């Protein structure tokens, strides 16, 4: 059982990892040693707890680290894998703040590919054990999110065969550009923020609109991103109006469905892409990121429905008429190839994270 994380503080997840280890399962965890703002005291306590239980806890850290940040959010249990946009903490998998997306798949091929990434990332000098670096890492105090949001998007299941693992700094950005370049009808993008107007993936989305693809981009309105996101949205809407192209951008405010946008995904015709990749150069070129692309009508329609509901619930301008409003569910998202928006669902014999 492997779990890859940027941050890890969700006690339910920790308890299940320890329970698996107590059953004799080989359990390994890899986390980022220097997340933005510093490692929290809560996370240090969690890593102590896991180590004491016999879990192999590794930390990506040091001047020789291969990646700027170890930023993926995935888990592998036998031949089942979970890939998330959300961190393993109350605000993310705990359902207490962020809108996120996620996917559970029983594809042995996908599980094997993710396991290979995990093993590659944990077998070098920049991933020492937690015990070895515990005294070197300074921690900070931080309060956990405590919000509560109803879930109105039940999981859906499908038998999708076309799944592709994407990783940065390897193939993720180029694969997404290719996918966007091949989009014919509709492109939906959800991101906390976008690096700048000239970012490669944004340019691909603008080109799609220029050739007639209906493009919608939903960004976060949280305090640390609102000003830049609003400015970008206004620039792109003005450009779309001047050129009369089907491009709209909206900044989502906090609402009854979520506290902030944290999902990183697209729906491009019948393909959905879910993962940790932010739309900026650092994420694509310097971080370890993981995503999965799924070509399947059921999955694409599910995320599309969630996107539209979020667009209508908390935007700052621009209409969206792809579905009548009375057909749209509201609330948090969980999908079982599965979508997850604030709660992690890994349904295999080693782990069960209860939906709430």
Residues of each region from the PLM?
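Histidine-dependent nucleotide/RNA phosphoesterase domain, centered on the 2H-phosphoesterase fold
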Residues: 59-61
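Short, basic/aromatic beta-hairpin or loop at an interaction surface
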Residues: 56
């Amino acid at each position: 059982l492997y779990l890859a994380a940027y941050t890890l503080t969700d006690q339910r997840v920790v308890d299940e990892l320890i329970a698996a280890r107590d059953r004799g399962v080989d359990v390994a965890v890899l986390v980022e040693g220097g997340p933005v703002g510093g490692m929290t005291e809560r996370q240090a306590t969690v890593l102590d707890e896991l180590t004491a239980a016999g879990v192999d806890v590794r930390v990506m850290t040091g001047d020789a680290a291969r990646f700027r940040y170890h930023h993926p959010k995935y888990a592998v249990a036998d031949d089942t894998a979970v890939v998330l946009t959300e961190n393993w903490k109350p605000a993310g998998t705990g359902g207490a703040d962020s809108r996120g997306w996620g996917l559970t798949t029983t594809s042995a091929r996908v599980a094997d590919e993710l396991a290979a990434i995990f093993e590659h990332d944990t077998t070098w000098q920049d991933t020492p054990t937690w015990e070895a670096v515990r005294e070197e890492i300074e921690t900070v105090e931080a309060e956990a999110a405590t919000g509560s949001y109803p879930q109105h998007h039940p999981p859906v299941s499908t038998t999708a065969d076309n799944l592709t693992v994407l990783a940065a700094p390897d193939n993720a950005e180029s694969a997404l550009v290719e996918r966007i370049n091949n989009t014919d009808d509709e492109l939906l993008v959800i991101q906390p923020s976008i690096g700048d107007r000239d970012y490669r993936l944004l340019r691909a989305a603008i080109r799609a609109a220029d050739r007639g693809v209906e493009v919608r981009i939903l960004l976060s309105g949280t305090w640390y991103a609102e000003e830049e996101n609003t400015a970008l949205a206004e620039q792109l809407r003005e450009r779309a109006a001047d050129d009369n192209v089907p491009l709209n951008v909206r900044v989502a405010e906090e609402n009854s469905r979520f506290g902030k946008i944290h999902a990183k995904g697209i729906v491009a015709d019948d393909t959905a892409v879910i993962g940790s990749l932010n739309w900026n150069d650092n994420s694509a070129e310097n971080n370890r990121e993981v995503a999965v692309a799924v070509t399947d009508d059921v999955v694409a329609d599910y995320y599309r429905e969630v996107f539209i509901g979020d667009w209508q619930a908390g935007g700052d301008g621009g209409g969206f008429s792809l579905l009548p409003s009375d057909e749209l569910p509201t609330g948090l998202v969980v999908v079982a190839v599965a979508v997850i928006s604030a709660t992690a669902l890994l349904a295999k014999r080693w782990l069960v994270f209860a939906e709430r």
